[in-house]
Amino acid sequence: HKIFFTGEFSKKIGKKNTISMLIKILENRNLLKNQKFDIRIKKKIPVRAGLGGGSMNAANIICYFVKKKIIKTTKKDLKLITKLVGSDVILGLNSTNTVYHSNDKISRFSKCKKFFVLIVKPDYGCSTKEIYSKVRKFDKPKFNRPNKDMFNFDYLKKMNNSLEPIVLSKFKRLRKVKSYLDSMSKCAFTRMTGSG
């Protein structure tokens, strides 16, 4: 197999990535039937942006393989495969307005309000392992009883990322970026994605 990443955010992707992991899992389960593939991904989401770009790459490859009948498997096995690649890969199988519960269930909602979002990605990232190691108290799960209101503006504005204070205390430059964005007149709210 050959895996190629192109696009402005392709430079920092190593040989071990979600696509290579997925291919290895599919081969180990003999789902590819010794077929070889050239896979080309145009990377449109920055690496380590906390937006699940790598997970969605893998999910798109799975969707393609299933749609083209390259792999044949059960829904149960497909769910297991996505979990082996990454916990949020399953969201990419049908990603619009989807909430992944902490108890492995998925809820989907239709006709949710759309927002204009500005994404700011500094030229550095944080180690997820390091950031989580500094958490002293975990918040209670917020998505175990999801409903459509979770996609409303007021609900989203009240939400927070528990990891954000840890990251902001570590990176002074990021505090300045957040402060600047908060001061903009038409900015409704700012939020860090993922673990920084």
Q: Which positions does each model-derived feature cover?
A:
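N-terminal beta-alpha supersecondary unit
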Residues: 1-35, 133, 153, 161
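Phosphate-handling active-site elements
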Residues: 30-38, 64-85
